[in-house]
UniProtKB/Swiss-Prot annotation:
Cofactor section: Mg(2+)
Name by which UniProt lists this protein: dITP/XTP pyrophosphatase
InterPro entries reported in the protein's UniProt record: dITP/XTP_pyrophosphatase, ITPase-like_fam, RdgB/HAM1
Cited Gene3D superfamilies: 3.90.950.10
Keyword vocabulary terms for this entry: Hydrolase, Magnesium, Metal-binding, Nucleotide metabolism, Nucleotide-binding
One GO molecular-function entry: ITP diphosphatase activity
GO CC aspect terms: cytosol
Function: Pyrophosphatase that catalyzes the hydrolysis of nucleoside triphosphates to their monophosphate derivatives, with a high preference for the non-canonical purine nucleotides XTP (xanthosine triphosphate), dITP (deoxyinosine triphosphate) and ITP. Seems to function as a house-cleaning enzyme that removes non-canonical purine nucleotides from the nucleotide pool, thus preventing their incorporation into DNA/RNA and avoiding chromosomal lesions.
EC number: 3.6.1.66
Keyword Nucleotide-binding: yes
Length: 195
């Protein structure tokens, strides 16, 4: 079975893929290309995921998977959306992004939100395929938990009565937006092997 190449340098994302593809070698693109970076100019998660997977597939001449994901807060008209990673500005980190979001929600009652993940799979001379996963939750007023990354410490999942940062990687793989999208991808790849 071929390696699963992920067009990301984000170890958190790579770990999410490894948690589901336990019997395959999952590698980040930095192991194959030094300083791979694609400007995310798309207006949607799908456009950004495709930009990354298509550029990486072209550069490596092999199948590559990429994702774009983020947080959509309903009371903020979908913000931070595609700007989730740079919500507080370029050069800022997860803590800065969380702080900006909590400030923007300071007097807001409706704190419903969803994480969205679109995975794209591209290969030379093939049409890019996409897989979308979501998970619904509520933005807390303070951080809880140490597991995960990004907005996980303030994203509360009512069904689990925990934030995403309080659940195990295995639990996260089963319910998270990325976990849902990765499972759809895995199902597709397993079906591909039986053709």
């Amino acid at each position: 079975m071929e390696d699963i190449v992920i067009a990301t340098n984000n170890q958190g994302k790579i770990n999410d893929f490894k948690a589901i593809f336990k019997n395959q070698n999952v590698i980040g693109i930095s192991e194959l290309i030094e300083d791979f970076d694609v400007e995310e100019t798309g207006a949607t998660f799908e456009e950004n995921a495709k930009l990354k997977s298509e550029a990486a597939a072209h550069a490596l001449n092999k199948r590559v998977i990429a994702d774009d994901s983020g947080l959509e807060v309903f009371a903020l008209n979908g913000e931070p959306g595609v700007y989730s990673a740079r919500y507080a500005g370029l050069g800022k980190n997860d803590e800065d992004n969380i702080e900006k979001l909590l400030t923007n929600l300071e007097d807001v009652q409706d704190r419903r939100a969803q994480f969205v993940c679109v995975i794209s799979m591209s290969a030379p001379n093939e049409k890019t395929k996409t897989f979308k996963g979501t998970v619904s939750g509520v933005i807390t007023t303070e951080r809880h938990g140490k597991n995960g990354f990004g907005y996980d410490p303030i994203f509360f999942v009512p069904e689990l009565n925990k934030t995403m940062a309080e659940i195990t990687n295995d639990e996260k793989g089963k319910i998270s937006h990325r976990g849902n999208a990765i499972l759809l991808l895995k199902e597709y790849l397993e079906g591909e092997q039986h053709v």
